[in-house]
Amino acid sequence: MDSPDRFYRKKVAQPVNVTGVFVATQEAVRHMKQGGRIIHIGSSMTRYAAFPTAAVYTLTKGAITGFNRSLVRDLGPKGITVNTVHPGPTDTDMNPADGPVAAIVGPGMAIGRYGRPDEIASVVAYLASPESGFVTGADIVADGGFTA
C-alpha cells in the first residue's frame, strides 16, 4: 500500500473523508435544536465494487457508513435524520466522463453514461426536504446501475 498516492493518503483521505466528516457533523449537530438533516456523501464504489489501488479511498468512504449507523440511534430521538448518498461515476472536474477512469468504469454503467452533478444533488435535495422526514439510516445509491 506504499504507492504514489502517499500524499493522498496522508493529506486528503483521512483529514477530509473521515476527520472532516466527523468535525463538520459534530458542529452541525450543535446547531440543530429542533431536529434537522444530516446527509453524507459516500461512494457506490465502496459499497459494492472495489478497484485495485482504491483501498484507502474505500476505507475512508466506508467509515462514513459505520459512523452514520451509530448517529441514527444517537440523533433520532432529537428529530435528526441521518442518511448517506452513494454516487457512482459522476462527471466532475476530478472524474470527467471522458477521463482515463471512464474507459474502466464506462462498460459497467447500466445506463451507459456517467451521472451529472445535478442528478446527485436532486437526491440530496429530497433527503433535505420535509418529505423525507421518516427516512433515516438509509444508504441511497445513485450510480446509474454501476453496482447493479
Label for each model-derived stretch:
Residues 109-120, 131:
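A conserved structural motif in NAD(P)-dependent oxidoreductases
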Residues 49-58, 70:
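Active-site loop-to-helix junction immediately N-terminal to the catalytic Tyr of the SDR YXXXK motif
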Residues 76, 81, 135-137:
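Short, small/polar-rich loop/turn modules that mediate ligand/substrate recognition or access, typified
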Residues 47, 82, 86-97:
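Short, flexible catalytic-loop segment of classical short-chain dehydrogenase/reductase
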Residues 48, 125, 136-148:
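Short C-terminal tail/terminal secondary-structure segment
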Residues 25, 60, 68:
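Active-site helix of classical SDR
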Residues 30-31, 73-74, 133:
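Alpha-helical segment proximal to the catalytic Tyr-Lys
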